[in-house]
Amino acid sequence: MKYISTRGGMAPQSFSDILLEGLAPDGGLAIPEQLPQVDAATLESWRGLSYADLAFEVLSLFATDIPAEDLRGLTRAAYRQGVFKSEDIVPVRELGQGLQLLGLSEGPTLAFKDMAMQFLGQVFEYVLTRRGTTLNIVGATSGDTGSAAEYALRGKQGVAVFMLSPHGRMSAFQRAQMYSLQDENIHNIAVRGVFDQAQDIVKQLAGDLAFKTRYRLGAVNSINWARIAAQVVYYFHGWLRAAPKGGEVSFAVPSGNFGNILSGHIARGMGVPIRRLVLATNENNVLEEFFRTGVYRPRGPEHTYATSSPSMDISRASNFERFVFDLVGRDPGRVASLWADLARDGSFDLSALKPQFETRYGFVAGASSHADRLLTIRNTFDETGVLVDPHTADGIKVARQFVEPGVPMLVLETALPAKFAETIEAALGRTVPPPADLADLESLPQRVTLMDCDAQAVRAFIEAHAKV
């Protein structure tokens, strides 16, 4: 399996190469030359597998340059009890009225990002050790990616992490998870701005090929294909757990940067019988607007709202380019032209392709408000006893619009509610204690560097602290 760029300017590379590469040299994103296919008989044969062994089967289709027994060791190290609280790794719970909850928050940072990041922590160390080199991870987080990456990579050999976060725009629990880490290879940088500005700095630094090469910059954001591939596994798992034999399921996905639902798009393209991919946004509804109108119109920082589902306060979805690549017939020249239009005009129009969004690719979309979130959290708890976080509530609210008889609808859990205590208290009128082992998290000393949104200042910080 080789990988190319969505913009056509990268020679085919292996899985391990793109794992370390991050953004492609031409500014595009790595994508498989062709998607591997899984037939119905193979799918059925995977029903009895553990999550770790299912991950091996799926990831072996993408990471063809890693010997099979080595890869199996990596997936078993990543997906095991002790790292994850549930024996199933990803439990499925009933929510009633045709909905089920895919439990993706059983990992060490209580968020779905752990599902991919625990594998990345293993495979980064594996590849770097065998190549005898180092890597400096530079990423941006709106709340959950940062802590998941840092917990997966803390203390790992040959890796340093530089994680940018928007100052004052994450929950207290999210900040404490990241900033309380004291490991010497973890560096937190809070920038005075919004997530999109932090992400722009990361892309700017990654786009400087001389700097990227000298300091061996890598990525753990979902621009890294390994993140997307690892997330594909839980769509297979969800189908195997919820679908009647040979039947279809739908997935509802709270969406900000388009990485999570993109993995569903990939799983569907590989052969998982997915009826619909239901995209749910909050008030920052750039993606919902695209699937409703066909026009992609990102907003500036001044029009990116601070909401009660803060991890989705994103107005430029970096992973969207991979879907557009498929939408325009895998034409890299067309993708490069569209992103040039975006840079020049601030938008592009694919409304002529709008009929394909659902009929060919299964995408539908909806948005949720603060009032919707509070009501959904309260009603879900009252009706089922299941407490969900505000992002998952966005998913449930939108999912209800698209439930079909006989087609299970799995809502992807985003995080545990303890990470968003203020919103849960507003919804239920009472506080939700964090897990016992994290009760003192917010009182721990915190280590973070505060900066303006200045790529040169971030560059200087990396130069001073990088592993070289």
Place the predicted regions along the sequence by residue:
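PLP-dependent amino-acid enzyme catalytic core
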Residues: 1-468
